[in-house]
Design a protein with these regions (language model features):
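N-terminal secretory signal peptides that target proteins for export/translocation
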Residues: 1-20
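Bacterial N-terminal signal peptides
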Residues: 21-34
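Sec/Tat signal peptide C-region and signal peptidase I cleavage site
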Residues: 36-40
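Contiguous, structured surface segment used for ligand recognition
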Residues: 41-180, 479-482, 486-488, 496-501, ...
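Substrate-binding groove of N-acetylhexosamine-processing glycoside hydrolases
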Residues: 48-51, 56-58, 63-66, 81, ...
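Short, internal active-site loops enriched in acidic
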Residues: 116-118, 269-270, 327-331, 380-382
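Feature activates predominantly on carbohydrate-active enzymes
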Residues: 121-323, 337, 362, 366, ...
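N-terminal leader/propeptide and maturation segments of large enzyme subunits in energy/redox metabolism
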Residues: 327-343, 348
Length: 687
């Protein structure tokens, strides 16, 4: 593959000089302006996410062993030193080599050269670029500021691989910077309180994938989960006893800043606010504050309260952006309140959306008076909305594009709702720009990026990690890497590697299912239950809520809570089934397909007695039987295909109808190998 740039040469590895730093920045600027696209095979050889903007492969590899040493040069501060320590901690966990002890004593072979400081409060659009040169004998990471260093260190960690002779990193030269400046993850601590340790380890995962905005949502109808010193009844009466102290919030903000992550708070208003009214009923629109979900936007009491509250929270959160929500506001409480209706008539406010716009205008001014920029969901966008308000879109790329055409900056979340159990591929193909041909260059700049959203309506702190990871890595790549990086097969191959890497950061997504299955079964190693769990998924989108009744206190301890949103086994089997049905499969793929189908057919006999032992697993009995029957059909289809036998047309049709019934949810689960078996059946010949 032709590349447009050359290696920087040996001078890049010489002792640090300012001229070297300037030279790297200049070269990096031109290189990053014209990124080199790696083919899928080259992407796979790196095994990392996100794919960097520009990569040049070299010769050999850099060995990681007990002699490893890393030195900081140029600008230095305590944050860089902590970053070096975290880097060594992760590298030590991956290799098993106690590098955190040795690295301070060993001669350095890894040089981190930082040009200057970052902003005291991290800013939107702050430079995150870096230049990483890895050779067999030396590594040099150069960046204009600590943010770039943080990103480059994560790239190196992802490049570490085990070989027949030890741990090593391929010789490459990388020039990299993000495509979008806003690359976020929303964690909803409003529906359910999310403990600080869970928040922190997900910030570690964000650092690994170069995400840079933690959108922290604190309140909803179900609870108010942050301490207010000005209005203590908010947390005392509205939290159920679970809330973050302001000291804990400051601790998380500092933890995030160390990792190059901004923290943007969200306080959703004027709706989703029932929990506010438990302590402060005068704010409510409805007759019964305990049943009301909308703030009264016509009362002076409301704005006096919110001015003080927003001032308190704006002082607590240093980021320049403040999210005021504004979504899903049902105007029925305003319409049924005579006093509010009289206010609307007196002020020529025609309907609920217009009244919300009146409220939004006042809130935006309160936020701006605290020198913050308001962020809001799609609903806050009205013809008279101030142009500096940032729109977060749950409606989709076209809605975001229209906002950009009207002069607004925006962030996309539609397509990135990771709580809805969609596949990594579905998220991966959603681009914040949508169809970019409909936007001018200036309008494209207004699309700031996107956010994965982890709503906690039916997610607990126990299973949150396997709902967020590893699929969010696919979204992180979409937001960092070039638009043309879209090969789904390559993404999945790299996602497998990245998923394992995330374990070294303390994330628990790979362990959660097994632990929950052990509890469900009462067995220390319920192998047959794991076989079933490997090929089922929770239903997608909102179907799960239609099949099972959830409340704020529903125990999330069933199979649909335990299994990840996407079955790797089913996806891999589907790829093999496609190749078999098209006549392109290798003998090894035929063998693997037969081995899987045999395992699934025979698993039911071992699993049924286990399922009967526990009230948490009894409802899985028909799912297990279904898997056995579907697998038996698959084995017959393999025999027919291999032996070129014909199948009676009527029999095949009845078999397909059975498979279509089997594909429907049972026990709030989807049997994900059914479409693949149907593909095999449809590939057989009929008489």
């Amino acid at each position: 593959m032709t590349r447009v740039r050359q290696s920087l040469g040996d001078s890049a590895l010489a002792p640090f000089r300012l001229t070297d730093f300037v030279r790297v920045l200049v070269l990096g600027f031109f290189t990053l302006s014209y990124p080199v696209m790696l083919c899928a095979e080259e992407q796979d050889s790196l095994g990392i996410m996100p794919i960097p903007a520009n990569v040049t492969h070299g010769e050999g590899s850099f060995v990681v062993d007990g002699s490893f040493g890393i030195a900081l040069e140029g600008f230095q501060d305590a944050r860089l030193e902590r970053a070096r320590q975290r880097f060594l901690d992760v590298l030590s966990r991956e290799t098993g080599i106690p590098l955190w002890r040795q690295a301070a004593l060993n001669p350095s072979h890894f040089f981190v050269r930082t040009g200057g400081l970052s902003a005291t409060v991290q800013q939107l659009g702050e430079d995150e670029s870096y230049h990483l040169e890895i050779r067999a004998t030396k590594v040099v990471l150069t960046a204009p500021n600590p943010l770039g260093v943080l990103r480059g260190l994560q790239t190196f960690l992802q490049l570490v691989a085990i070989t027949a002779t030890g741990f090593s990193v391929p010789a490459v030269t990388i020039d990299d910077k993000p495509r979008f400046p806003w690359r976020g993850l929303l964690i909803d601590s409003g529906h359910r309180f999310v403990p600080v340790p869970v928040v922190k380890r997900n910030l570690d995962g964000m650092e690994a994938l170069k995400l840079n905005v933690f959108h922290w949502r604190f309140a909803d109808n179900q609870g108010f989960h942050i301490e207010s010193k000005k209005f203590p009844l908010l947390q005392e009466k509205g939290s159920g006893g679970f809330y973050y102290s302001q000291d804990e919030v400051r601790e998380v903000i500092a933890y995030a800043r160390d990792r190059g992550i901004r923290v943007v708070p969200e306080f959703d208003m004027p709706c989703h606010t029932t929990s506010w009214f438990v302590g402060y009923p005068a704010l409510a629109s409805g007759k019964d504050p305990s049943q009301s979900s909308a703030i009264d936007p016509t009362s002076r009491v409301t704005y006096d309260f919110l001015s003080t509250f927003i001032g308190e929270m704006a002082a607590l959160f240093p980021d320049s952006y403040f999210h005021a929500g504004g979504d899903e506001c049902d105007p029925k409480e305003w319409e049924s309140n005579p006093r509010i209706q009289e206010f609307m008539r007196a002020h020529a406010i025609t309907d609920g959306p217009a009244l919300q716009a009146y409220f939004t205008e006042k809130i935006q001014k309160i936020i701006a008076a605290r020198k913050k920029i308001m962020v809001g969901w799609d609903e806050v966008l009205r013809p008279d909305t101030p142009r500096d308000v940032v729109i977060q879109s749950w409606r989709g790329p076209e809605s975001l594009a229209q906002a950009a055409r009207e002069g607004y900056r925006g962030v996309l979340s539609s397509g990135y709702y990771i709580d809805l159990n969609q596949s990594a591929a579905e998220h991966y193909l959603v681009d914040p720009l949508g169809d970019p041909s409909g936007l001018s260059p200036e309008q494209k700049k207004r699309v700031l990026g996107g956010e994965a959203t982890m709503w906690t309506d039916i997610v607990s702190d126990e299973n949150m990690d396997n709902r967020i990871w590893p699929r969010t890595a696919a979204i992180a790549e979409r937001l960092w890497s070039a638009e043309q990086v879209r090969d789904i097969d390559s993404m999945y191959r790299r996602l497998r590697s990245v998923s394992q890497k995330l374990v070294y950061y303390g994330l628990r997504h790979r362990f959660i299912m097994d632990e929950m299955l052990e509890r469900m079964s009462g067995e220390s190693d319920p192998v047959p239950l794991k076989v079933l769990a490997a090929v089922v998924q929770p239903p997608r989108l909102y179907q799960r809520q239609e099949l099972r009744t959830f409340s704020d206190f529903t125990p999330l301890n069933r199979m649909d809570d335990a299994v990840p949103p996407e079955s790797d086994t089913a996806r891999e089997f589907n790829e093999i089934a496609k190749r078999i049905s098209s006549g392109q499969a290798t003998p090894e793929e035929w063998r693997r397909a037969r081995a899987w189908l045999t395992l699934w057919r025979d698993n039911d006999a071992a699993l049924q007695p286990l399922l009967a032992q526990s009230f948490l697993t009894k409802d899985l009995a028909p799912v297990s039987r279904n898997l056995s029957q579907v697998a038996a059909i698959g084995l017959r289809a393999l025999d027919d295909l291999q032996e070129r036998r014909t199948m009676n047309g009527q029999d095949r049709q009845s078999t397909i109808e059975f498979l279509q019934r089997s594909a429907k949810p049972q026990a709030v689960l989807l049997l994900m190998v059914v479409p693949s078996v149907q593909l095999l059946v449809e590939a057989t010949r009929t008489d």
